[in-house]
Amino acid sequence: MSFTGERKGRLIVFEGIDGTGKSTHIGHLRKYLEEKELEVVQSFEPTRGRWGRMLRDSAVTGRLSVEEEVALFLKDRREHVKMLIAPALARGAWVLLDRYYLSMMAYQGARGIDPEVIRAANEEFAPVPDAVVWLDIPVSVALERIGNRGERDAFETEAGLAACRSVFASVHAPWMLRIDADAGKEEVAARVRKALSMRFPDVIGA
């Protein structure tokens, strides 16, 4: 079984280990698409819903077991798809997400759950992205950027980030767009647009 909802819009996901600048580049793309008078819906995961708040709280109050995390992520994503993602795609909007189930594959995969099992569980109900913009930077650069913003969470160690990055690197699909994000913001934005222009030449110019 897989997502069978109506799909007139496009789903673009920004992924990467912490410190890659996902929110910055989602903002650039949103502005570009809105200037073309397209409807854009921007969101993130985990959400601010009931299940997402539990996941966020766990990062502060103490980690849940990986099995508990997986269960909560699936509940949060089901609600997200039903309430926001699917309706937006059905009416023709461009949906831009800061993280999606590839992050779950990477982060919970790094804690011992088979990433392909996670992928299969999600694709039973969640729409496959039209494009994933994987902002890739070396772990050392990510740690430097994270250090500049303050406290780290449980995954923000060299070993943790390296494990997550290796999962992202293992995903091979036509919609997976690797972007070298170890550069200035304007240069990375140009690389993102060029990659997306090849995926959506009728809408996005290089």
UniProtKB/Swiss-Prot annotation:
It catalyses: dTMP + ATP = dTDP + ADP. It holds the Pfam family Thymidylate_kin. Keywords: ATP-binding, Kinase, Nucleotide biosynthesis, Nucleotide-binding, Transferase. Its EC number is 2.7.4.9. GO terms for molecular function: ATP binding; dTMP kinase activity. It comes from the Bacteria. It is an enzyme of class 2 (transferase). GO terms for cellular component: cytosol. Transmembrane segments: none annotated. GO terms for biological process: dTDP biosynthetic process; dTTP biosynthetic process; dUDP biosynthetic process. ATP binds at residues 16-23. Disulfide bonds: none annotated. InterPro entries: P-loop_NTPase, Thymidylate_kin-like_dom, Thymidylate_kinase. Belongs to the thymidylate kinase family. Phosphorylation of dTMP to form dTDP in both de novo and salvage pathways of dTTP synthesis. This is Thymidylate kinase. It comes from Akkermansia muciniphila (strain ATCC BAA-835 / DSM 22959 / JCM 33894 / BCRC 81048 / CCUG 64013 / CIP 107961 / Muc). The gene is tmk.
